[in-house]
């Protein structure tokens, strides 16, 4: 074996064994050459390809540095026809980012099948953090409309991504992907989405202007015909809705305004409401065109038997508890947690991320799919300190212990590659956001339902064995599902009320407007502290009902500019939000009892429920009298 072959063998052996120290030693002794970095092992892999497959970030970083120093080209193909970037798109997001940041990286390099790295990225990348590497691709000038041998674009490939397909499709469309590029069989991404049976994907592609009349040469079917064949009534109806609009636009010569109609969601059943204001929103300025559109939409309205549009109503449905997922057991690190019943440890490949819902100090929240169910996925930030791990375990412990229809359902946790909590998705958002939506009519019936379900959720926690104190109860932490049911959530600050947790419970937590006075004075946080928070939520609900719009607690006190001022005033001056004058005395009394400065005087959740039922019966016996108390404030009043 020659010295060059010996060096090459030593390098490949060290990389295969993830021995970074050995590679550094070889480098320091000048035993790694440019040819070593561009050579292949018996399986046709380069040293960098091996490091990428091993997902070893430190090794990849080291080899990339050596490529720069020795001027080795990382864009060359291995014996399997793949470049380093083709391989990197299947790696951890940090590793992919590092390869993309390499100065001379070729993002459009094609393999034997003419697939570019972004083809594979769109199909195989798993992390919900797909936006950052995608933007690097864009900055490097990637061709998002590149076609492989079969004519497939990255958009076609994204349809097959089992983890982040909807997010990937969205990124592609926002960055110039042509929604109507077809394969050699004349099939568009819309054909692929219909076959997959994903109505959400179909909707996104249609809104982007997908051609509904494109006929595939293999089966001689349009996407609409495929949907009919699949027997998917909802998808068929959706595609027909777009097809009818496109046909109408073509018939009257308005095709060039298709995107404007789609953006404003002006379909055939809405065209009768066309107005000058809507045309302004659509950006249609030509006087002649505006007159023609108004004339044709008016004619259409006269032809149709129009159904009167009604404001959004809150519909009562029979409540059904969520299904309990299969249990796969606990990992060793969580097995010793006390009070934990059955819980599911979820593999990351069982999840599909569909939409980013928000971000906070603890991480990001995505909407997604788990075993066909729509879920919320809380992806926690990287946890490197033992304190952060302990906080995760405590929330995991609480979530795993509770099984109640009044508490957001916990499906399980993902432990790698990132810590995630997988929960029931409540599509209407928080109770705060529901109350803050002025288009919703929240009368007394809805107020009582929201109040009773909130208290039942907290009662469930307080009656658990051992009892659980929420500690961060507020309208933002009460979620509303599509059936308008309240679900208690966010147990990041919650604790079992046991001896070992007393010291932790003393620490001030939660939002100050909902915080009980005893917490300010450093006393033990108890179930009665949660009851104080319930009082503020009852105040929010009653005020929203009577005034017809949401008012923030303590917003009437203009001198209180900061949250900490609120807790000082509530504790030292016994300040409370102002209850509306029109509020029935029975509700006034209940709210005041719940936020009594002396925690011993506050009722239990069971007592609150009993009183709420009595008050609701009082309302039902005097519905007109109670409804007369609702006098909405002017919309422009602060």
From Swiss-Prot:
Q: Where are the transmembrane segments?
A: none
Catalytic residues per the record?
Answer: 472
State where the protein is found.
Cytoplasm, Cytoskeleton
Indicate whether Transferase appears among the record's keywords: yes
Q: What is the lineage of its organism?
A: Eukaryota, Amoebozoa, Evosea, Eumycetozoa, Dictyostelia
InterPro entries on file: Ankyrin_rpt, Ankyrin_rpt-contain_sf, Kinase-like_dom_sf, Prot_kinase_dom, Protein_kinase_ATP_BS, SAM, SAM/pointed_sf, Ser-Thr/Tyr_kinase_cat_dom
The record, for PROSITE patterns, names: ANK_REP_REGION (PS50297), ANK_REPEAT (PS50088), PROTEIN_KINASE_ATP (PS00107), PROTEIN_KINASE_DOM (PS50011), PROTEIN_KINASE_ST (PS00108), SAM_DOMAIN (PS50105)
Q: Which Pfam families match?
A: Ank_2, Ank_4, PK_Tyr_Ser-Thr, SAM_1
What protein does this entry describe?
Answer: Stress-activated protein kinase alpha
Any idea of its EC number? 2.7.11.1
Write out the PTM section of this UniProt entry. Answer: Autophosphorylated.
Stretches assigned to the SAM domain: 240-303
Annotated GO biological process? actin cytoskeleton organization; chemotaxis; mitotic cytokinesis; regulation of developmental process; response to osmotic stress; signal transduction
